Swiss-Prot record:
This is CinA-like protein. HAMAP family: CinA_B. It comes from the Bacteria. Belongs to the CinA family. InterPro entries: CinA, CinA-like_C, CinA_C, Competence-induced_CinA, MoaB/Mog-like_dom_sf, MoaB/Mog_dom. CDD domains: cinA. It comes from Shewanella woodyi (strain ATCC 51908 / MS32).
Length: 424
């Protein structure tokens, strides 16, 4: 099967918005053994859309078209497809009824322009959109099936998962099995990882890839064919042996997801006191439904006064060691845990930059503590300081990893190779 994607919209073409749908789509499909072989971005011009639909439908077997299904005058994908086919637009009564019901349920008046979203090219198969007002549709042109989906990410992703993937699995079954293993790493750059892992011989059918998204690097082992799949466990073991503690999770996207799952399953509670990370630790967890079951509180105690009055940090500790110190974050973590008697508490304090560093504590210095019922674990690291955002995201990730290791009964303080640790 030859799969392609056409993304529409002037704002995408002009770079005014980042097309995250295309990256997600390609990644989702490759994990199922299907490669997106071409991606084209087209602006909101009717003649350009018609031309690209006609051209690519003679080459591809399946084309995912994303965007241009809204109610406004620059949403032209449906009209362009009708012109490419040489057929009229006809009203889909089922979708019109759903539109009317949706607006009534939400106590809103449906604009006349929304009726445009019930018009489909004659002969099209309507694709349900359970979370939006723009239905999708599928129709064949030349040799290709074209699937039209809205550009709103959560609508697009749900339609892909629930309708597009089942379609291709039914009509274009894979000729051989595939398997994917993902390892999430922390503390190495992409080139450094590649240098370390190039010594591993990869059997036929196995590929090793990297995906960077701050502050992580994801290693992806992809196997096509049963013999290749059978070798994955051995290769995974070798990768973990080489990288050691830099591998922080498996088959998930971020550590906050891992922490969320662990705390929900364990029943333990957490409080957070943040200075340099400014709420990132708590925010990452609150992004997941159900976090109220374990997250007692998230405090951003940025000033020394807040550290003293809210968390009970001893003013003498701040005078003797400074806000960015192991002594201070230990007292912050103890104070945060004690307020609501949480099982665990995380605390951070650091110098995110670009100013504020010194010879003793340069920009990128971050102190992190984890308080438990039995004691406190703490460390102060020198993190890469290319940007303020990087320092904060790395500090957040390391705090998560300390808690993750504690929950697993592993050593909490470990060597991440590329991060240097202060002795005090």
């Amino acid at each position: 099967m030859k799969l392609e994607m056409i993304c529409t919209g002037e704002e995408v073409l002009a770079g005014q918005i980042v097309d995250t749908n295309a990256a997600w789509f390609a990644n989702t499909l490759i994990e199922r053994g299907v490669e997106c072989q071409r991606r084209i971005t087209v602006g909101d011009r009717l003649e350009d859309l018609v031309a690209v639909f006609k051209e690519r439908s003679t080459e591809a077997d399946v084309i995912m078209v994303n965007g241009g299904l809204g109610p406004t005058s620059d949403d032209l994908s449906t009209e362009a497809m009708a012109l490419a086919l040489g057929v009229p637009l006809v009203e889909n009564k089922e979708w019109r009824s759903k539109l009317e019901a949706w607006f009534a349920k939400n106590a809103r008046v449906m604009a006349e322009s929304n009726l445009k979203q019930a018009l489909l090219p004659q002969g099209a198969i309507m694709i349900d959109n359970p979370v939006g007002t723009a239905c999708g549709f599928a129709i064949k042109l030349n040799q290709a099936w074209l699937f039209f989906t809205p550009g709103v990410p959560f609508e697009f992703k749900r339609m892909v998962k629930e309708q597009f993937i089942p379609f291709i699995e039914e009509h274009f079954p894979l000729s051989e099995p595939v398997s994917v293993k993902k390892l999430l790493t922390l503390g190495h750059g992409e080139s450094a990882l590649a240098d370390k892992l190039e010594v591993i011989p990869l059997p036929k059918g196995v590929t090793l890839g990297y995906r960077s998204y701050m502050p992580y690097i994801e290693i992806k082992l992809f196997a096509r064919g049963q013999l290749a799949i059978d070798s994955l466990a051995t290769i995974e073991t070798e990768v973990k042996k080489i990288l050691g503690h830099s591998v922080v999770a498996e088959d998930i996207t971020t550590l906050d997801q891992e922490i969320h799952n662990s705390l929900v399953n364990s029943g333990f509670s957490l409080s957070v006191a943040e200075s340099c990370t400014g709420g990132l630790i708590a925010s990452g967890l609150v992004a997941f439904a159900g976090s109220s079951a374990y997250l007692h509180q998230g405090l951003v105690t940025y000033s020394n006064e807040a550290k003293v009055k809210v968390l009970g940090v001893n003013p003498q500790t701040l005078d003797d060691y400074g806000a960015v110190s192991i002594a201070t974050v230990e007292e912050m973590a103890k104070g945060a845990r004690g307020i609501l008697d949480s099982d665990y508490a995380l605390a951070t304090s650091g110098i995110a930059g670009p100013d504020g560093g010194s010879d003793e504590k340069p920009v990128g210095t971050v102190a992190i503590a984890l308080a438990t019922k039995y004691g406190v674990y703490s460390q102060m690291l020198k993190l890469p300081s290319r940007s303020r955002a990087l320092v904060r995201s790395l500090g957040t990730a390391i705090a998560y990893d300390m808690l993750r290791r504690e929950l697993l009964g592993e050593a909490v303080i470990v060597d991440y190779s590329s991060f240097s640790r202060f002795s005090k």
